[in-house]
């Protein structure tokens, strides 16, 4: 009888051990899946790339939540900037932000030129108003510099030529999570053979052969939120010299 009791106790302990081990593996699987959740969240917008004609966004609806008022078709905001540091510890940053209102089917925004200084000096910033008609950027402000004027009128957002159809092939990224926000980040090493990298090198003066990092950042619910945001960065930085392209496409209420 004592033998049977000991045997039953042994079986119970083994079942408990397997149950605990199973729970541990379940937690690991859950944590490992965060990378896939981040990619799937980004894919909701990146699958739209390339958006060759930005006016197509007038007919596309994004994630809607309780922040949207009844009848509000929402507004898309597309953004791209290129930042490059120089030897004197200054950072030059140029780019454009465009708001496409689906209610009025109008697109307005601005091109910006910024310079940041390392020392105790406020940054310089200049905005130039633009609008878009027939998928063409129209400069509304007077610009004396012919080179700057050309850059503005010929500007293309990263989302107009980027292609992330193979996003699912990016694996083993470096994932970090801040549960307090919450915010989620994942980083991947890119190849110089990547078509997106080739496109950026052909459009910007990138003085390094270093293969960049793809950085994906999400603030808010992974399932979607009109309050949070997603930001994609392709970082070419080398030896303390910042060189990067930042892109985002967001969908928010147009009516406050």
From Swiss-Prot:
Q: Does the keyword Signal apply?
A: yes
Give the residue numbers of the S-diacylglycerol cysteine lipid attachment. 23
Q: Which domain of life is it from?
A: Bacteria
Could you tell me where this protein is found in the cell?
Cell membrane
Record keywords, A-Z: Cell membrane, Lipoprotein, Membrane, Palmitate, Signal
What membrane topology is annotated for this entry?
Answer: Lipid-anchor
Could you tell me which Gene3D superfamilies the record lists for this protein? 2.50.20.40
Region forming the signal peptide: 1-22
Q: Which GO terms describe its cellular component?
A: plasma membrane
Q: Name one Pfam family in it.
A: DUF576
* Lipid positions (N-palmitoyl cysteine): 23
The record's similarity note reads: Belongs to the staphylococcal tandem lipoprotein family.
Q: What is this protein called?
A: Uncharacterized lipoprotein SACOL0481
Species of provenance? Staphylococcus aureus (strain COL)
